[in-house]
């Protein structure tokens, strides 16, 4: 197995550095070829590393910096005045080729701006996109992008999202010709504005993309599409609505189970079954949104992620490294754009 090296911004999230360190420990145990560089404040990190016997680990090292980017910092300010932050240093390690990927639970806006500056976009890509997977009752999961990096998109940007999502699905999930759909207010061909209509036409004309039509928001978890394409505004709202409904469902279920002695006894019997059946719906299993379209691999973890969730984010970074996702996207995009040029000259 070839060596893999991941940089982790340990100062990003909402819950302190112990979560990324615990996740790093788990990932090192799972992958004997993995090396991890933790970036952050030595004073805060060393006690945690020593607690979990990681301070002398042969495959883990620490880069010290006093500075971090909080969730409240304006992204533009972070770009101009936080060049020595843990997030920026982790991204620089990727751009310098010293690590294969970067994982951060920090400020999303700052991460996107800093990553675009440090790594640049791939040829033919004007805007990177956030992509993550959602649980799907038929397929196991479905990828959706964009999830908030680009609030407004033209048809060509959405088209590029479809190409990038297809490559990720083809490589990571080993699916030939994955089905691509566009999120819309209806499934009918005439629904949606000019941007969606034009994007649909572009996808129909591209033989290297398996376009499957429009999909509505109520089908996110049941559709037969492997990739759902949308602008960042709609994608972010859809994602957070799903997360909110999941929390409501969980809270109401606990409330119902604890409402009486009978329900508590019944709940004790049903809980193991429910836990097993609903495990694939747990948001921790889907943590880790990749910022694709860049010349390097960057994975954004949820700010409040626990150990399991952050480990999943690291796993995403490992998979994308193993499948060389940026290079694969660049190759596919070159083929698709060449095909479009040929069509325009016919």
UniProtKB/Swiss-Prot annotation:
Principal EC category: transferase
GO cellular component: cytoplasm
Protein's job: Catalyzes the reversible formation of acyl-phosphate (acyl-PO(4)) from acyl-[acyl-carrier-protein] (acyl-ACP). This enzyme utilizes acyl-ACP as fatty acyl donor, but not acyl-CoA.
Subunit note: Homodimer. Probably interacts with PlsY.
Listed name of the protein: Phosphate acyltransferase
Places the protein is found: Cytoplasm
Any one Gene Ontology BP term: fatty acid biosynthetic process
GO molecular function: phosphate:acyl-[acyl carrier protein] acyltransferase activity
Entry similarity comment: Belongs to the PlsX family.
Pathway: Lipid metabolism; phospholipid metabolism
EC number assigned by the record: 2.3.1.274
Gene3D superfamilies to which the protein is assigned, alphabetical: Isopropylmalate Dehydrogenase
Catalytic reaction list: a fatty acyl-[ACP] + phosphate = an acyl phosphate + holo-[ACP]
PANTHER family: FATTY ACID/PHOSPHOLIPID SYNTHESIS PROTEIN PLSX (PTHR30100), PHOSPHATE ACYLTRANSFERASE (PTHR30100:SF1)
Entry keyword set: Cytoplasm, Lipid biosynthesis, Lipid metabolism, Phospholipid biosynthesis, Phospholipid metabolism, Transferase
Principal cellular location given in the protein's record: cytoplasm
Pfam families in UniProt: FA_synthesis (PF02504)
